[in-house]
Amino acid sequence: MGIRSYRPYTPSTREHSVSDFAEVTKSRPEKTLVKFRHRKKGRNNRGVVTCRHRGGGTKKLYRVVDFHRNKHNIPAKVAAIEYDPYRNARIALLHYQDGEKRYILHPLGLKVGQLITSGVNAPLEIGNALPLSKIPLGTDVHNVELVPGKGGQMVRSAGAVAQVVAKEDQYVTIKLPSGERRKVRASCYATLGQIGNIEHRNISLGKAGRNRWKGKRPTVRGSVMNPVDHPHGGGEGRAPVGRSGPVTPWGKPALGMKTRKKKKQSDALIVQRRRKSSKRGKGGRQS
């Protein structure tokens, strides 16, 4: 995957860059594996905004991706690599020997025509899914399950990769992309390899309109609103907040207040918390 940049013909193309889609081999999705997905626009079942800055965007068809990899010991041939508008990773179309077709996340290095499989006795090759107990230490994995049989929930974005670092009786310790080290049941499945489209993080949108195409609306500071709209609003000119600390639009403490529950069931499984992100730069620093 490469990145194509544009000359500054207009202000929006000055910093504009897109993927060259060199790895994509098919433009139209498989009709049996797509469905219409109603867009929530940040509302709940009562129509109340629960997540701000969502709405608009282009219409898209949802590709049904197989995160379970539960067709064990049945080889599948990689028929095509496709673009998925709902995620930043590419997806691979599989044709199983029994005639079924499924989408999976496209691992880096997986080519059209290769055969992959899943199961306890699957070979240690890119794209194959195995229980964590069968994966050697130091192996790169993605699409990791948290609950056996529930399907992969972690390490699913473009370029993401986790690593198996330790094994115990019933648990396997993996290092996540955030730097967190976490115990997962040894019977949970994971897929070998790293997610493809690793250059996605280097793409520059170039203009606000590309965020609107994604369904992301502008974020407005509370200090420039009216008092009826935000606790920070009002005053003459650039007025201070008027409180002991910043708060959310609903009056709860914000910016630094810890929101994680003190007694969380997964605390016993987290060996090392994720590294703190730097506020000054894009990168992170280890704690």
Swiss-Prot record:
The keyword Ribosomal protein applies. One of its GO terms (molecular function) is rRNA binding. Residues 209-287 are annotated as: Disordered. Keywords: Ribonucleoprotein, Ribosomal protein, RNA-binding, rRNA-binding. Residues 209-219, 272-287 have a biased composition (Basic residues). PROSITE patterns: RIBOSOMAL_L2. PANTHER family: LARGE RIBOSOMAL SUBUNIT PROTEIN UL2M (PTHR13691:SF5), RIBOSOMAL PROTEIN L2 (PTHR13691). One of the primary rRNA binding proteins. Required for association of the 30S and 50S subunits to form the 70S ribosome, for tRNA binding and peptide bond formation. It has been suggested to have peptidyltransferase activity; this is somewhat controversial. Makes several contacts with the 16S rRNA in the 70S ribosome. Part of the 50S ribosomal subunit. Forms a bridge to the 30S subunit in the 70S ribosome. Belongs to the universal ribosomal protein uL2 family. This is Large ribosomal subunit protein uL2.
